[in-house]
């Protein structure tokens, strides 16, 4: 089951709109997380104001049991393409689970059994060869397979609604191109996740 908290705008006193990110809407998603074993998919971009989402959840006594980190690692200090194995976040002590310890470049069943709900909070840039959306899709597939819920805290696409480039020919599907979308696709991760479900693009036509 996929739940998405979309971004919204707030008209401030200065008559300027400020984007309210999905992760700032704590009154909406804290009740969803209550009593759950939580895993997060995030990195150094997952900031709620001046604090990381992980710190916000732990400060509010939520049971965060695992972290899935994307390319470059949870703290953003790994090299491009570097394999990130199981480890522990030095700051919080929360285990970091490998995304690739199972078959088909997905988390293993043992990793998936550790949590009830996956929270996604990561900044994407709307490019087909950017790997974060590919990791999201693989996690959505694993969550669909093991009946785990997904909560996606959405963020704006910095390239707006700009769309450009050819759609990927799926015979060239790879680790830097996973969906039949343009090079610049013009969607947020939340919008893309909805499209993945709607078009049944996950393996075996699974729906998260």
What residue ranges belong to the model's regions?
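Glycine/threonine-rich flexible loop motifs
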Residues: 124-136
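Conserved anion/nucleotide-ligand pocket segment
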Residues: 173-208
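Glycine-rich oxoanion-binding loops at beta->alpha junctions
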Residues: 85-115, 127
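Bacterial Sec-dependent N-terminal signal peptides
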Residues: 1-17
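Short internal beta-strands
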Residues: 63-73
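N-terminal phosphate-binding or glycine-rich loops at protein starts, especially the Walker A/P-loop
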Residues: 18-62
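Glycine-rich, charge-decorated loop segments at or immediately adjacent to ligand/cofactor-binding or catalytic sites
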Residues: 76-81, 151-173
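A short helix->loop->beta-strand "cap" motif at the edges of active sites that frequently abuts
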Residues: 62, 145-149
